[in-house]
């Protein structure tokens, strides 16, 4: 009986972990707050509106766009993308900052997050093509604008992967991205399961096989490092040295893949996606220099 239980557990655990990763349960979704959007627009001296597109596979994706009073003169636009389990709400502080500096700022709910449909989160496999649809939308509001991107964690990794096909980005800022989804999973499984790190590899192998057989997803193709290796778009990598969710070594690997077109800023004392909290002024100055150079 013990042996049967172990076998069942060995089969069930990768399936459970895969389903949890691919589906953000309704109770875990962060719902956008229109009142907060109104507040941010007022503080930034901007107008705002609902944004909506359909993805290539028919998913209804939602967001907000903030248009500053100077947007016609500035000709600058930025797409802001949150991390896993968050929503556009988590990027509103950045929207305010960019709107105050004359950028049209688009904050979106990534597929499977907030109120965007999905139905599944794929960590870049499908999301990278969503970025092209969002770029089309934003540039339809601001024809000829210079387009930029800023993402956090999963959002950072999606933006890097989007550079495979989306050539209109002038530059991108990516905080705490993963080099590959396999590497990200390897770091998280011991924390999620309490199992020793040595168990991560076989669990990931089984989980990735399940994702391929059940949904047709090749999660090994989620590889920001390969996208960065190929791109000519400048990418500023930011990583907190106290990050306990995504090891700073992942950003180092990304930078090493294409040092000619990337720069790495490591922030002492900053935890996961907390660089703008620990070093706010320097964060803002570096990002603006990166976009405007």
State each model region's role.
Residues 2-54:
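An N-terminal hydrophobic leader/cap segment in hydrolases
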Residues 97-117:
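Conserved alpha/beta-hydrolase
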Residues 84-97, 110:
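The serine-hydrolase catalytic nucleophile loop
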Residues 121-142:
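Alpha/beta-hydrolase active-site loop
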Residues 270-284:
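Catalytic histidine-centered segment of alpha/beta-hydrolase-like enzymes
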Residues 230-232, 237-239, 243:
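Short beta-strand/loop motif that positions the catalytic acidic residue
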Residues 161-217, 226:
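Hydrolase active-site cap/lid region
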Residues 244-250:
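Conserved alpha/beta-hydrolase "acid-adjacent" motif
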């Amino acid at each position: 009986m013990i042996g049967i239980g172990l076998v069942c557990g060995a089969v069930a655990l990768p399936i459970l972990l895969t389903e949890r990763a691919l589906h953000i349960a309704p109770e875990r979704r962060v719902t956008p707050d229109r009142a907060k959007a109104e507040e941010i627009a007022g503080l930034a001296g901007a107008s705002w509106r609902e944004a909506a597109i359909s993805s290539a596979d028919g998913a209804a994706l939602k967001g907000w766009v903030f248009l500053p009073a100077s947007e016609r003169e500035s000709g600058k636009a930025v797409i802001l993308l949150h991390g896993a389990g968050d929503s556009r709400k988590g990027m509103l502080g950045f929207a305010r900052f960019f709107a105050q500096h004359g950028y049209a700022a688009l904050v979106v709910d990534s597929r499977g997050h907030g109120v965007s449909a999905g139905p599944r989160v794929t960590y870049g496999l499908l999301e990278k093509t969503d970025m092209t649809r969002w770029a089309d939308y934003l540039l339809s509001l601001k024809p000829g604008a210079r387009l930029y991107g800023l993402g956090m964690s999963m959002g950072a990794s999606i933006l890097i992967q989007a550079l495979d096909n989306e050539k209109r980005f002038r530059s991108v800022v990516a905080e705490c991205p993963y080099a590959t989804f396999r590497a990200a999973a390897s770091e998280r499984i011991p924390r999620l399961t309490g199992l020793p790190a040595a168990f991560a590899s076989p669990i990931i192998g089984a989980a990735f096989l399940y994702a391929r057989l059940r949904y047709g997803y090749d999660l090994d193709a989620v590889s920001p490092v390969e996208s960065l290796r190929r791109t000519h778009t400048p990418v500023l990598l930011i990583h907190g040295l106290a990050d306990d969710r995504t090891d700073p070594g992942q950003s180092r690997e990304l930078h090493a893949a294409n040092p000619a077109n990337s720069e790495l800023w490591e922030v002492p004392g900053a935890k996961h996606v907390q660089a703008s909290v620990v070093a706010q002024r320097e964060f803002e100055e570096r990002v603006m220099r990166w976009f405007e150079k």
